[in-house]
C-alpha cells in the first residue's frame, strides 16, 4: 500500500504512544496514517509496566492479547533505597488477583501495539521517517505557555522519506508527534525542550542468565527490584523477563559515571564497568553471583526533560517526544499511553464538535503536564533518599525500612488508586503522597512560605488575594504552581478515574463510537493549590 497524499490525522512514531493513539482514533472511524522510522520488531529499553496498563489496553481491546502472550507477570516491585530494608509495592493486594502487570520484551510488546493499530483500521507504514513539517499561520493569541500551549502556526503537511530513498509529502488536519526522544516538534520547531539538571544521567545495561531469583521461596519471588548504590551515585534495576533472562541496568549521574570510568584500570571492558556499578548494590549483587552475561552491554544518555508546551493548533505531543523522567518507578509506558489516550480524546472531541481546538488542546496539555509533574516529584523524593543515604528523607530515624513510605507512594507508583479505596479517600491518598514528597524535598519546610500560602487561602475571593499573589517571589510562585498542579490530579487507575478528571470544565468521554470531551462545571476548590492565577 502506498502512503496516501492526505489523511485526517498523521501520527509520527510507531512506539507505544503513537501506536496507541492511532488505534484509539482508528476505532472511532478516523482516517489515520501512522509512520514508523524503523521496522518491527526492533529493540528498545523500558521493559517494566505499571498496573494502569491493563485499563489502558482494555480500552482498545488489547488486554487479553498481552495476557495470553506469556510476558513475565509483575505482581509488585521492591525498592531498596539505602541500607534499610526494602519497601515493596504489592499490585495484587491493592488491585485484586488480576491486578498484576508485566515485564515485557519491548521488541515483542511494541510490535503487538503497532500491529493492533493496523487491525484497528489505521494505515501503518514502517521504515518511513518524518523529515519536516509545514505550518500555516493560525490567528489565535490564546495558546500560551501558561496553559502548556504554543502557537507556531497550524501544521498542514509533512515531508517523509523511506529507508530505501523514496520520499513524498502528506497533508493532514491533525498531527501527533510520537517520535520519542527525537521529538521532532519540540526539538526542531518549538525548540522548547528543557533538561532537568538533577537528572543528567547515564544508563548502562545488559542481560544475564542463571541468577538467583529475588526473594526466593516467597510469594514475592522473581519480582523486580530497584536498589540504590551504597555511595549514593545512582541505582540499579533487576528485571526478570519471560525469555529466561534478567535485565540488569545501572543509572548514574553523568559526571560521576565519567569519573568512575576514568578511575578504572586501562583496558576495563564495558561488562566490567557495569559489574563495578552493580557491586555497589549488595542485594542485587548477591542474586547475580551465579549468573552469566548473555548479551552485549548497551549504554545511553538517560536525561530527564520536559517542555513549556505539549500542544498547539491541531497538534499534540505524546510520550517521550514531550517529556521523560528517570525510570526508577517505571513511569514511561504509563505516561506514553495515558498521553496517547488524551491525544486521541482531544482530537476526536474537535472532530465531533464537542469543543473548539483551543479548549481541546488545553485540556490535553494540562493532562500531560499534571501526570508528568506528579511522577517527577515522587521520583525526585526517592532519588534524594538514594543520594543522601543515611539521612531520613522518606523514613523516620527509628524506622527499619520504607514500607510506610511506599504505602503512601503506592497510588502514584502503581499508576492507579487502590480498588478498595473509596472515591473520597482517593483524593486524601494522593494528597498524602504529595505531602510526603514535598516534605522530603523541603518544599514546605519554609515556615515563611507556609505563612504566605495560608494568607492567600484565607484571602480567597478578595482584592487582598491579588495583592498577596503579587508579593510572591518567582520561587514562591513556582512552588504555588507546583502545588496547584499536583493537588488537582487523581492517580490514573480504572478508566473512570481518567474520565472523572475535570480540567477547565471538561471531562473525557471514554466510549467507543463517541470518544471525546464533555463539558462540565469548572472545579472551584478551597486550597491554595488550586487557585486560578
From Swiss-Prot:
Griseofulvin is a spirocyclic fungal natural product used in treatment of fungal dermatophytes. Signal peptide: none annotated. Keywords: FAD, Flavoprotein, Monooxygenase, Oxidoreductase. FAD binds at residues 14, 17, 47. It catalyses: griseophenone C + FADH2 + chloride + O2 = griseophenone B + FAD + 2 H2O + H(+). It is an enzyme of class 1 (oxidoreductase). The keyword Protein biosynthesis does not apply. Pathway: Secondary metabolite biosynthesis; terpenoid biosynthesis. Chloride binds at residues 331-332. One of its GO terms (biological process) is griseofulvin biosynthetic process. It holds the Pfam family FAD_binding_3. It comes from the Eukaryota. One of its GO terms (molecular function) is FAD binding. This is Flavin-dependent halogenase gsfI. Its EC number is 1.14.14.-. Flavin-dependent halogenase; part of the gene cluster that mediates the biosynthesis of griseofulvin, an important antifungal drug that has been in use for a long time for treating dermatophyte infections. The first step of the pathway is the formation of the heptaketide backbone by gsfA which is initiated by priming with acetyl-CoA, followed by sequential condensations of 6 malonyl-CoA units. The resulting benzophenone can undergo a spontaneous dehydration to form norlichexanthone. Disruption phenotype: Impairs the production of griseofulvin, but accumulates the intermediate dechlorogriseofulvin. Belongs to the flavin-dependent halogenase family. InterPro entries: FAD-bd, FAD/NAD-bd_sf, Flavin-dep_Halogenase_NPB.
Amino acid at each position: 500500500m502506498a502512503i496516501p497524499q492526505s489523511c485526517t490525522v498523521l501520527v509520527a512514531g510507531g512506539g507505544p504512544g503513537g501506536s496507541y493513539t492511532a488505534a484509539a482514533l482508528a476505532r472511532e472511524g478516523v482516517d489515520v496514517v501512522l509512520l514508523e522510522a524503523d521496522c518491527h520488531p526492533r529493540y528498545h529499553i523500558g521493559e517494566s509496566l505499571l498496573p494502569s496498563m491493563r485499563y489502558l489496553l482494555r480500552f482498545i481491546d488489547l488486554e487479553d492479547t498481552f495476557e495470553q502472550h506469556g510476558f513475565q507477570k509483575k505482581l509488585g516491585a521492591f525498592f531498596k533505597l539505602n541500607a534499610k530494608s526494602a519497601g515493596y509495592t504489592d499490585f495484587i493486594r491493592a488491585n485484586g488477583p488480576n491486578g498484576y502487570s508485566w515485564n515485557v520484551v519491548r521488541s515483542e510488546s511494541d510490535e503487538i501495539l503497532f500491529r493492533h493499530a493496523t487491525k484497528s483500521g489505521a494505515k501503518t507504514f514502517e521504515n518511513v521517517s518524518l523529515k519536516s513539517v509545514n505550518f500555516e499561520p493560525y490567528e489565535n493569541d490564546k495558546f500560551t505557555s501558561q496553559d502548556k500551549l504554543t502557537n507556531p502556526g497550524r501544521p498542514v503537511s509533512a515531508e517523509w522519506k523511506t529507508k530505501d530513498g523514496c520520499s513524498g509529502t502528506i497533508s493532514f488536519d491533525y498531527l501527533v508527534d510520537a517520535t520519542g526522544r527525537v521529538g521532532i516538534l519540540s526539538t526542531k520547531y518549538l525548540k522548547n525542550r528543557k533538561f532537568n539538571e538533577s537528572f543528567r544521567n547515564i544508563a548502562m545495561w545488559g542481560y544475564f542468565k542463571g541468577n538467583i531469583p529475588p526473594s526466593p521461596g516467597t510469594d514475592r519471588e522473581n519480582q523486580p527490584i530497584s536498589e540504590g548504590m551504597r555511595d549514593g551515585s545512582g541505582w540499579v534495576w533487576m528485571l526478570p523477563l519471560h525469555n529466561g533472562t534478567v535485565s540488569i541496568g545501572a543509572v548514574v549521574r553523568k559526571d560521576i559515571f565519567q569519573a568512575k570510568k576514568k578511575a578504572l584500570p586501562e583496558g576495563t571492558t564495558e561488562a566490567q564497568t557495569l559489574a563495578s556499578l552493580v557491586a555497589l548494590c549488595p542485594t542485587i549483587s548477591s542474586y547475580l553471583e551465579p549468573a552469566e552475561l548473555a548479551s552485549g552491554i548497551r549504554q545511553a544518555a538517560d536525561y530527564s526533560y520536559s517542555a513549556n508546551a505539549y500542544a498547539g493548533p491541531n497538534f499534540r505531543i505524546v510520550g517521550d517526544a514531550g517529556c521523560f523522567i528517570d525510570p526508577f518507578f517505571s513511569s514511561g509506558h504509563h505516561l506514553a499511553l495515558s498521553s496517547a489516550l488524551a491525544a486521541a480524546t482531544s482530537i476526536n472531541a474537535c472532530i465531533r464538535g464537542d469543543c473548539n481546538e483551543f479548549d481541546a488542546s488545553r485540556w490535553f496539555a494540562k493532562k500531560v503536564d499534571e501526570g508528568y509533574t506528579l511522577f517527577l516529584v515522587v521520583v525526585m523524593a526517592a532519588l534524594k533518599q538514594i543520594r543522601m543515604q543515611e539521612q531520613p528523607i522518606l523514613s523516620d530515624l527509628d524506622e527499619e525500612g520504607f514500607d510506610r513510605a511506599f504505602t503512601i507512594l503506592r497510588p502514584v507508583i502503581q499508576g492507579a488508586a487502590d480498588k478498595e479505596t473509596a472515591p473520597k479517600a482517593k483524593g486524601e491518598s494522593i494528597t498524602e503522597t504529595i505531602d510526603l514528597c514535598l516534605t522530603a524535598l523541603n518544599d514546605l519546610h519554609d515556615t515563611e512560605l507556609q505563612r504566605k500560602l495560608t494568607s492567600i487561602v484565607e484571602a480567597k475571593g478578595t482584592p487582598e488575594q491579588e495583592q498577596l499573589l503579587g508579593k510572591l517571589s518567582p520561587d514562591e510562585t513556582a512552588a504555588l504552581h507546583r502545588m496547584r498542579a499536583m493537588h488537582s490530579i487523581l492517580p490514573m487507575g480504572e478508566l473512570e478515574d481518567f474520565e472523572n478528571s475535570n480540567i477547565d470544565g471538561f471531562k473525557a468521554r471514554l466510549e467507543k463510537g463517541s470518544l471525546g470531551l464533555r463539558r462540565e462545571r469548572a472545579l472551584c476548590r478551597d486550597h491554595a493549590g488550586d487557585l486560578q492565577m
